[in-house]
Amino acid sequence: MIQISALPAFTDNYIWLLQDHRSQRCAVVDPGDAAPVLAWLEQHPGWVLSDILITHHHHDHVGGVERLKQHSAATVHGPAREKIPARDIGLEDNQRVSILGWEFEVFAVPGHTLGHIAYYHHGLLFCGDTLFAAGCGRLFEGTPEQMHHSLGRLAALPDDTLIYCTHEYTLSNLRFAQAVEPANPDIAERLAKVTQMREQGRMTLPSTLALEKLTNPFLRTGETSVKQKADERNGQDNQSQSAVFAALRAWKDKF
């Protein structure tokens, strides 16, 4: 049985730690800082870091890779189409990779960055900065059309999929979601719950895909209420769901 834990980093990052208690081997996802991982390894003598999974090239996701590689000789997996430090295995869309005995499917999800990938294994999704709890990543390199397509691909996964994104942005994302859909009771309920969780210092991840479909405006571009608000914001009739997405993303960037 593999256990998944979060190692907080910086102000709002989570490094996901996968632990196989039988073999005492572990893997990490997007270690932007080596220190939390090294501290965990020091507190757990006998454990070996065998693998590092990277979703994209931004420093807050790869900053700790080289130091961890030097410390552990872990195998570094990352997107083939991006420059990833100390990468051993470059991954493309639809490839499969075995980590701690689990087989992960790789999805190309361009938008936040052009080479961004996500890792999926039977109800678990490690999606970096593509899909957030109640939100999505900014478009630093890709187009709105690319990001909308990437999110649609992730949204096609089973509803009970657990969403392991890498930032604690849920509260601010839900405030935006409520501005988009002020009459949505699911958003109001989730906002109240998340507000309480954050006041108690608790993390709000992982999310579930089912919950995202109810409360994440970027997965709800086909809803009439969302389209109407997007049309109202940019003063035009958005003819496609990707156009609705683009209007929402531009609004969120300034929210």
Swiss-Prot record:
Gene3D superfamilies: Ribonuclease Z/Hydroxyacylglutathione hydrolase-like. Its EC number is 3.1.2.6. Keywords: Hydrolase, Metal-binding, Zinc. GO terms for biological process: methylglyoxal catabolic process to D-lactate via S-lactoyl-glutathione. Pathway: Secondary metabolite metabolism; methylglyoxal degradation; (R)-lactate from methylglyoxal: step 2/2. InterPro entries: Clx_II_MBL, Glyoxalase_II_hydrolase, HAGH_C, Hydroxyacylglutathione_Hdrlase, Metallo-B-lactamas, RibonucZ/Hydroxyglut_hydro. Zn(2+) 1 binds at H56, H58, H112, D129. Signal peptide: none annotated. Zn(2+) 2 binds at D60, H61, D129, H167. CDD domains: hydroxyacylglutathione_hydrolase_MBL-fold (cd07723). Binds 2 Zn(2+) ions per subunit. It comes from the Bacteria. Its cofactor is Zn(2+). It catalyses: an S-(2-hydroxyacyl)glutathione + H2O = a 2-hydroxy carboxylate + glutathione + H(+). It is an enzyme of class 3 (hydrolase). GO terms for molecular function: hydroxyacylglutathione hydrolase activity; metal ion binding. Pfam families: HAGH_C, Lactamase_B. Thiolesterase that catalyzes the hydrolysis of S-D-lactoyl-glutathione to form glutathione and D-lactic acid. PANTHER family: HYDROXYACYLGLUTATHIONE HYDROLASE, HYDROXYACYLGLUTATHIONE HYDROLASE GLOB. Monomer. Belongs to the metallo-beta-lactamase superfamily. Glyoxalase II family. NCBIfam families: GSH_gloB. This is Hydroxyacylglutathione hydrolase. The lineage of its organism: Bacteria, Pseudomonadati, Pseudomonadota, Gammaproteobacteria, Pseudomonadales. The gene is gloB.
